[in-house]
Design a protein with these regions (language model features):
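Conserved donor NDP-sugar-binding/catalytic core segment of glycosyltransferases
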Residues: 33-84
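A short, conserved alpha-helix in the catalytic core of glycosyltransferases
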Residues: 103-162
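Glycine-rich, basic loop-to-helix element that forms the pyrophosphate-binding segment
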Residues: 1-19, 42
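Active-site-adjacent helix/loop segment of glycosyltransferases
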Residues: 151-248, 253-260
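Short beta-strand-to-loop acidic/aromatic patch adjacent to the donor-nucleotide binding site
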Residues: 21-34
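Acidic metal-phosphate-binding loop of nucleotide-sugar-dependent transferases
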Residues: 3, 32-34, 135
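Short, flexible, basic/aromatic active-site loop/helix in glycosyltransferases
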Residues: 77-110
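Short glycine/serine/threonine-enriched helix-capping/active-site loop
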Residues: 28, 55-63, 158, 166
Length: 278
């Protein structure tokens, strides 16, 4: 049975916690990641030093283009005011060459860390409610990092540590199913974690932006991706109440770190900016 990213790691971490009850840290590492020599030490030392740190990632570089950042996390994940995730070194499908532009400071607070290679504080992981298995694949780590943030934990990127990631291994880089999950899950984590008024405002704006994205897919002769966007919205509306009115008593809040107070869609598609800094 394929439990997905969330289900697989949740099961593994429950077993590990039971066997090693005093374990402090664990690394979620995808099978298509190639760590570099010495990558682990700076992550572990930082976690030991900073008790408020819930999760940390290394730089994620492209296995096929070693001088470039890789899609899944690059130099640390951010979120724009419309709820679109992007990363330092990666906006939508465009990735930057790693020229050391994000190397200083060595540790930077971000909003979300890459699930491809993610060191977590085990206690924070369980305190935050584990990975949400309803998301199955794509953006589960963003949801987890958001909930860690709500519990008072910080998320960081360590640029003195790096790994290479092949990417697109589960569903493929241009899979319509990946498009479906990305659009649906990004909406679900907003209504789940953002204050209700903020979430409703964002969803209203996303109707326009996602429709524009669908039109772009059609213009590019990718009708299956347009259908995926439409399916994503119908699925989101069906699951809305389940996520918006969760039985948990967890507070909802907008991110404190790693938030870009602008529209990444506007800057990328209209202003043609391929790199966006906070």
């Amino acid at each position: 049975q394929n439990l997905g990213y969330s289900g697989g790691y949740n099961r593994a971490l429950r077993i590990i916690k039971e066997k090693y009850p005093h374990l402090q840290f664990s690394v979620l590492l995808n099978s298509d990641v190639e760590p570099q020599e010495g990558w682990l030490d700076p992550l572990e030392k930082r976690m030991e030093k900073e008790a408020s740190l819930g999760a940390i990632q290394p730089k994620i570089l492209d296995f096929h283009k070693p001088n470039n950042f890789e899609y899944a996390g690059a130099a640390g994940g951010l979120l724009d005011k419309c709820g679109y995730p992007f990363a330092r070194g990666r906006v939508f499908d465009d990735t930057e060459e790693d020229k050391g532009q994000y190397d200083y400071p060595e540790f930077s607070k971000i909003f979300w860390a890459s699930g491809a290679c993610l060191m977590i504080r085990v206690s924070a992981f369980f305190e935050s409610g584990l990975l949400d298995e309803r998301l199955f694949a794509h953006m589960e780590e963003i949801d987890l990092c958001w909930r860690m943030n709500l519990k008072g934990y910080d998320i960081e990127c360590c640029t003195s540590s790096s790994v290479f990631h092949v990417g697109g291994g589960t569903l493929g880089a241009i899979s319509p199913q990946k498009t479906y999950l990305n659009f649906r899950n990004s909406l679900l984590i907003i209504v789940k974690n953002a204050p209700t008024i903020v979430a409703l405002r964002i969803i209203s704006g996303r109707l326009f932006f996602d429709a524009a994205a669908g039109a772009l897919f059609l213009f590019r002769r990718q009708p299956q991706h347009l259908i995926s966007v439409i399916k994503a919205h119908f699925s989101f509306y069906k699951m809305f109440s389940e996520f918006a009115f969760s039985p948990s008593n967890q507070k909802k809040s907008w991110p404190k770190h790693g938030l870009y107070n602008g529209s990444v869609v506007w800057n990328y598609f209209i202003r043609k900016k391929e790199n966006i800094n906070l």
